[in-house]
UniProtKB/Swiss-Prot annotation:
Source organism per UniProt: Phocaeicola vulgatus (strain ATCC 8482 / DSM 1447 / JCM 5826 / CCUG 4940 / NBRC 14291 / NCTC 11154) (Bacteroides vulgatus)
Entry superkingdom: Bacteria
Name of the gene: dapF
Record protein name field: Diaminopimelate epimerase
Enzyme Commission code(s) on record: 5.1.1.7
Classification of source organism: Bacteria, Pseudomonadati, Bacteroidota, Bacteroidia, Bacteroidales
Residues annotated as the enzyme's active site: C75 (proton donor), C223 (proton acceptor)
Length: 280
């Protein structure tokens, strides 16, 4: 007998996920659900699945499954959406929320008005600057290395924001064939657990134009951890200051790499697309 699951589709700067409150709707096989529901033609259509649950360490917990069923350590856009979800659903009246993720406890500050969450600031923690072989184990020092792929050579800066990223600065982002080079860099032998890939152009106003190929999901409209990694890489490569706007296909995020505490703070919107029920 099929089980009916309630869900909410939400998006943060165009990065859309299917959200299930497991406090009220337990989900037995999230890997299968992520693969089935993320498909646009035969499912709900999304970049993946997010489970909102209880936590012994924080106010709530978050688990993220990419469209291919693989589990992600962290998602900045999803964390903002969870802040909006739990507040507007009446699961909390707090405007500062702690969220347990596989990459640690994140602190969310909700910017509200008339009972609605307008924007969310997430303390993304301290970036871990690693070489490719260590980026998944979160040790080592920052490394910029030339990566051969798709008949070209790319100079990448490696940053871990709870998940691995390689940030590549280019003169003209429109010339990047992301569908071709994205999967080759994601699965490059340098990255034992695969990686997220960001191509970045510095715009005349010093903002950062970014396009992303996400590990396990492919091209997406935006990536919160990717925006943070991009801002950090821009500082390390002397291309931007510690406060910057990252402009993606789905919208803009403000990123602040705080010099005092070393933490990265991401601020941006979160929105509900629709709600529904689906059989599992």
């Amino acid at each position: 007998m099929a089980t009916t699951i309630k869900f909410t589709k939400m998006q943060g700067t165009g990065n859309d996920y299917i959200y299930v409150n497991t406090l009220s709707s337990p989900l037995q096989d999230p890997i299968k659900a992520a693969r089935k529901w993320s498909t646009y033609h035969t499912g709900i259509g999304a970049d993946g699945l997010v489970l909102i649950g209880a936590s012994e360490k924080a106010d709530f917990s978050m688990r993220i499954f990419n469209a291919d069923g693989s589990e992600a350590m962290m998602c900045g856009n999803a964390s903002r959406c969870i802040g909006k979800y739990v507040y507007e659903k009446g699961l909390t009246d707090k405007e500062v929320i702690t969220l347990e993720t596989l990459s640690g406890i994140k602190i969310l500050k909700l910017h509200t008005g008339n009972g609605v969450v307008k924007d969310v600031t997430v303390d993304m923690g301290t970036p871990l600057l690693s070489n490719p072989g260590q980026i998944a184990t979160k040790t080592g020092g920052m490394l910029a290395e030339t990566i051969p792929a798709d008949g070209k050579e790319y100079k990448g800066t490696f940053v871990c924001m709870g998940n691995p990223h390689v940030v590549i600065f280019v003169d003209d982002i429109k010339e990047v064939d992301l569908p071709a080079v994205g999967p080759k860099l994601e699965n490059h032998p340098l990255f034992p657990e695969r990686t997220n890939v960001e191509f970045v152009e510095i715009l005349p106003d010093q903002s950062l134009r970014m396009r992303v190929w996400e590990r396990g999901s492919g091209i997406t409209m935006a990536c919160g951890t990717g925006a943070c990694a991009t801002a950090v890489a821009a500082v390390l490569n002397h291309k931007a200051g510690r406060k910057s706007w990252v402009r993606m296909d789905g919208g803009d995020l403000h990123i602040h790499w705080n010099e005092k505490d070393g933490h990265v703070y991401m601020t941006g919107p979160a929105g509900k697309v629709f709600e529904g029920e689906i059989e599992m």
